[in-house]
């Protein structure tokens, strides 16, 4: 069955033509595959079968099938695997586990790439090895039309195969071929009968096309040149792709060729572009004679085929229709058991449907398709011919064809060549032969050709020979990869021809055949190559430029990935249109590139389109690489430095569209090294679509071809004459290029291959060229490349085997991965024009053609051998690459000067002189074509001295049409599209669909599976739905209503009860009785509810009345009791007076909160004995409550004793510096100046004075508001509000000593009182609604209000005031709502029961339905200052707001407070007065709280009325949320801009902008604020870093001086022979940092760290500097040098120096403080200016708002105007809110700045104190170091698991470092001054320290985690998060916006002797820490 097998093999290959390609994977490439890819490709190699004998044992024991069906292969780790071949799927599998293996990753036992088919024998296959692994063209040996057998029974080709495996006949032999055809047809007829039906398959399909095409064979060339254009255009690529080559259908057809003795088909001609068969001109008569028998045999066969074909329709009907196709290639193959295996199936129409693995044939094989598939074979030939024939006409006197060229050889070689190339894209059972065939090395060596012609048969018989020599050192050697490298090659007769000078080094090991068959195949290839060139020379050189169809096999590395345009996006890096650099200098794209290279931003806007050139006529598909392939690249490379290819790309825009580049080459095939003397390439450019990175592919030069009709390519294909040395190993045949003289009257350029790594758009890139002589091209280049083999010093280059040259690479392929090779003896020499004759031709000689006819001319000259120029993507850095990306517009004229001017080295002529053998081993001039086949590195060979061949590239008048090869060929070699199996067969991993889009096989397989599953599921779903429908049909229709409550209900037994019935129309008729019953039930429920509500209201009213009537008597009685108790308990009346006049005067406060606290504390010195009070309270409870807040702290930002500022209100020391970052904005206690806000007030359990503690603790406002004067100035409009801790401490202060408070107490309250009195009184001022504010931290079990509703005195107070319409307004701010059902109708009741009724203390938020209605009432309200309306009556609003007063809480507290010294009569009036004023305060605070506006802190100068919101218009226009009713109560101007942030609270949903606009506004605001403040803080930090650095430098200088001084002392002491203590020595010369003292590594402290660490930079005294302080301390205290009589003098002298050092340090510290303060003042003033500017706008905005709202109220606006005004108002609100936010943000930054500055100053002062102590010989530092540091560092670092005694540590620090921590507060804190810090520490509750102990150890390592790291600070604190922007800004203002921002004055003292710091700077240490 040999023929059958061969045919099967052929068909299989054709089937996978789109998917697979013979190419052996390079080891490197394989290794590069990552694990996922590898597993995806060939499964997990390591999944072995447990139950099967291990493969390694089976291999050792020889327990494997003899037929080779199961073999053993080894991976790189020597793991053994069973492997077998699955011919059906054409994959290698593990036979037991059935998973796929990638043979390219496996090796045989000798370490050579594994070749399965070397040992794979199919039964009955006589030539099995050759067939399975042979070259593609081998199947055509013996095929009529491809050649003939000569008298020696040797096969002579009548043409050659191009790189697409298209057979190109030799035209000159046509006459002979015709004869041969006739003769052979007869012979064939006889033979055909004996041939298996397999060959017939093609013929069956052939008949129709044949009948059409045969007559056209004789048509004149010009005619079918035109026809070719039309017909070719009509035949879309997809059709060719899907159906196989056109010419395939003529294989076996008589007249087209014949079968040789090997049953290989030999064409006797070729197909032109119109698919017309053109007989070979060169057809050899001898061959014809030799092939007579075959011709006859074949003709008979052909007749038989035609008969069968005619009978086919009849047979289709019969049941055995398919039997006729058994044995027909394309339908299946014979397996190893000689059983026929179908590769598809017949559908019901008897159309053959191939399996999915044969993607190309995946369409039903109808008759039409048979013809198509066969035609596929014919296409290349016909295409070639069309291109060639016109070229004949154009031949000028360029055809200097050596006479010795033998047509036979040419023909035979061309035939073989075509076979080879035709086979490449397909999967054939190719052996290692494929690995070693290199199309690029089609070098013309006539002698070799002759040998090959003669020995073709010999080869086949001797195929086994050479594999026996593997391992024989005479024939080669093993390289470092343990791969066999031959020292020569076997010729056609199987004789080993050694290469000179160990050329084998340059042969990749993969080229070394694994089997003899591979070698023979390669020799056949060489044959083909040689013949090709020979015949090409005989033929017109133009025609060979045709090799563009050769382009099919794209190298592995072609950029035709699934994103076809894989251009280099790096060229856009740095372009601000495409992205930006982030902080880490990393480039961030602002969009993405699509597959076409277009750049879109993230919004989808097209930012950049690469279509800068003119669109080509035909836009390629995304998977079509043609537009990406580099245009013209001339590669001149030395073989020994093949990786250093100089690649040049010529910018197509430089060329005229019409210009044509014609390469005419006349090469002497017998001569070996070709030395092109001139290469004049005339460019023909078509407009180009994209300026995208283009792929450069080498293209071998072919004889000139006219490309005028070429409509497919718009890129100039480059032509590269390749000069190789002769005596070529298997795949490289050298050509002597001395005669290679390309000429062109057009300015020439040297195109160069381009590696895809170096693509840049538009910009040509030049990688360092390293050739000996490089001259800039001007308009024309003559290139002499003269190399003789004797001149050449061949340096072998080892090539790894995975991408084998012989694996059917293409001349066009340069994109093959190749290992990086060191360049040897290559220098980049300055341009030398010696040997380069630059001729400038006249432009007039350019012949332009219409643009439409030229698309992508491909210039290839196959007469010139093309070297394998593999440019590895990874190693392409070493390649010299000149890229000029072609961008051609129709109008652009080609001007080579444009190219030359763009870059100095854009065009490079490489001159390789003869006389420098070590520099030149042969010049490879490769042309980069549109597609390139995978090729390995350039391999150098030594060769006999060559004769000269000439290639003349000459301008032609006529443009030749280049035939298009299948588009997919260009993807062969691209790993994204497939891979090479171990046979070097290209395996596609997918297929191309009708749109030429590549569909991944993985996808397709899974898709098909998915489709099957989907269909399965669909069918199941359909079945289910049918079943369901059937069920539904059976079910009553009404079942679907079960469960619908409109139709019934479930009873208690869960049985469905219908509420009605369905009538005959299936309409539901409800049961009337049920409906009525349900309605009645509902009505009853509602009625009950209403009754209940009414009863509730009545009960409430009655209760209020009763309570109010009882109130007076009860309270009088209570007051009497309390007065008696207090009189008994109180010792001095004076003490009570202190309570009455508690507050100090309101002088300008540094920080009012702090001042109050301090003044309170001061009065503790008065000896008020409050032991009784204390005994009343449980101390533990008090402490627990005190630190309630503390225990809730998580995520501490600041815990350090240095910077945790104190709130010393009373005995206890409280950390107020713990803040959660988010809580800063929401829950932080308000320490600063701000408006008064009422906290919920709760009544103490008892009325005794013992509850005063809780009372004070609970609400400090009561204390502050106790005694108010009515004569205070309006300036003090802001009140001090204490937080919980302040209350606690205040209470303690009162407890302790209250005497001293008397004098100043009134003054603090005055501001509060005055504010109220300066406003015209309104009843609203007295309202104190209970709001749901943050709950008091005091435990409920401690304080339980005893009385809820007693406040009769208040009623009297309120009766004095006028009723207001507002009184009826009942705002509902509380969640608990007992008023939810009360209609807004109670004013009459109020009037009636006014004295007695009090509302319940819970106020529920208004129902949304009533909000607008009630707001409308509120809108009439003007604050009393502006329009006090005495006529207003008291209404429900007053009732609601009075609740806290009414329920007696406030009264009880005040009563308890005053009852000690006030008689009952007095106390009533006093309390009334106090309550009145307090109500005023609370009311104001309430309004403010509700409106988020400081409505009461107005300047008396204000004249504008306050804005009033009027919502009486149609609610359709105004949809207000809860807060909006108050939004307009805006303060237009403030007393102090920096003090009051006028904030209009606008919730997000009120801003009438779209969400996007709002986000945009917020983003802009964020960006502005962040940028501005970050600039300032960066400036601040940099200044301080600079200061710190200077400080440290000075410091180090002092330290060094001290050490040198110490050194002198030490020497003197030693000279006096005094004993030195080890301590001294170690301290002076520390051998290593002491763990306890120098934790941070002293040695490195002076180097600035990359991060700014406040801990180490702000303080001179830190762990990095302890050594200096200790040193000073020891020196000062005479510890280092024992004082004796001998060294006393020296010690004193030394002490003087030490004191000078101390002085210097103090000076440095002093200057540091001055600089830090100066820097701080600058930044602070800048921030304040920002705030001021922002605040100036707020009143303007407010006034505009007022005006607009006045217009809304006062004017009757039409609907349009009304809407416009509303929009304006919303915009103003948004602006107001944004500016307010900005102010809040800046205020926060001011606060941060203060915090940082406070740390800095604190540390400087701390250092200063330490130095002062040292100088005064106070041994503080050693105590500090021994104790504090020990507990800090040893516990933290040395023994991190030991729990530290924080309490002891705390006390140590407090005792020993008073000034360091809190010296700044001494003047504020007399208690600290008098009692010392131990007092504080002793009074800290136990929980304080237990909390500390839970803190992470490292917290103490930095002073403040927020600020410990500069970059962290900047990152975290200058990014406004959305939370900040949307949360309650009034809270932020409360924290940051309310305090008066002051510049701390700094008064530098010039008196150095007075080193004490001025204590005048007043940073708010308290609030931020």
UniProtKB/Swiss-Prot annotation:
Keywords: Cell membrane, Cell projection, Coiled coil, Cytadherence, Membrane, Repeat, Virulence. Pfam families: EAGR_box. Residues 179-207, 214-242, 374-387 have a biased composition (Acidic residues). InterPro entries: Cytadherence_HMW-1_N, EAGR_box, EAGR_sf. It is found in: Cell projection, Attachment organelle membrane. NCBIfam families: EAGR_box, termin_org_HMW1. This is Cytadherence high molecular weight protein 1. The lineage of its organism: Bacteria, Bacillati, Mycoplasmatota, Mycoplasmoidales, Mycoplasmoidaceae. The gene is hlp1.
